[in-house]
Amino acid sequence: MTKVLVLYYSAYGHIEAMANAVAEGAREAGASVDIKRVPELVPAEVAKAAHFKLDQAAPVAKVEDLANYDAIIVGTGTRFGRMSSQMANFLDQAGGLWAKGALHGKVGGAFTSTATQHGGQEMTLFSIITNLLHFGMVVVGLNYGFAGQMGVKEVTGGAPYGATTITDGDGSRLPSENELNGARYQGRTIAETAKKLHG
């Protein structure tokens, strides 16, 4: 059975919701899916004062976990047009796996959130995808088979590089059904691709 890891960092729960949708899509394709989060780097008292969502069910990942999967789908909120420091710190620790070629040929993908429509979604996706390519992974985005990214009648996330959501500046906007459907579609597509490559 194809093994998929949905690896994420979520400060306020938006990416957690997207991660769950990505996992749903991968499971629809018959994959075995684990959802794990990267460690929080912000001191507990600061995170609490900033109202971070600290009650997330997903277990904390270990870097060595990455080698155990056929596909790894990475999600994090945007920080000034790039991935969060929490995710960058985690991926930076995968140098040993990189040196051994342990991630070569695995399928990867990225998803993200921003506060605004033009808040750096594509740049953040590229910052994740760059890491995946350096690891030797095969990257799968959110292709235009997902028609939900084609319309202009509603404010919505989604790009050919990966599923996205828009949170609003105060974080009050939760992922829309269309954005969650995009995440499901990407998760399903990545799982299907991994199955074709890895059996």
Swiss-Prot record:
**Which residues make up the binding site for substrate?**
98
GO molecular-function annotation terms? Answer: flavin adenine dinucleotide binding; FMN binding; NAD binding; NADH:ubiquinone reductase (non-electrogenic) activity; NADP binding; NADPH dehydrogenase (quinone) activity
Instruction: Give Gene Ontology CC terms.
Output: membrane
Chain residues that bind FMN:
10-15, 78-80, 113-119, 134
Q: What class of enzyme is it?
A: oxidoreductase
Record Pfam families? FMN_red
Q: Which domain of life is it from?
A: Bacteria
Cofactor(s) demanded: FMN
Keyword terms, alphabetized: Flavoprotein, FMN, NAD, NADP, Nucleotide-binding, Oxidoreductase
> How and how many cofactors are bound, per the record note?
Binds 1 FMN per monomer.
Q: Does the keyword Flavoprotein apply?
A: yes
**Residues holding NAD(+):** 12
Its Enzyme Commission number(s) read: 1.6.5.2
Q: Which reactions are catalysed by this chain?
A: a quinone + NADH + H(+) = a quinol + NAD(+); a quinone + NADPH + H(+) = a quinol + NADP(+)
- Every copy of the Flavodoxin-like domain together lies at 4-190
Sequence similarity? Belongs to the WrbA family.
- The protein here is known as NAD(P)H dehydrogenase (quinone)
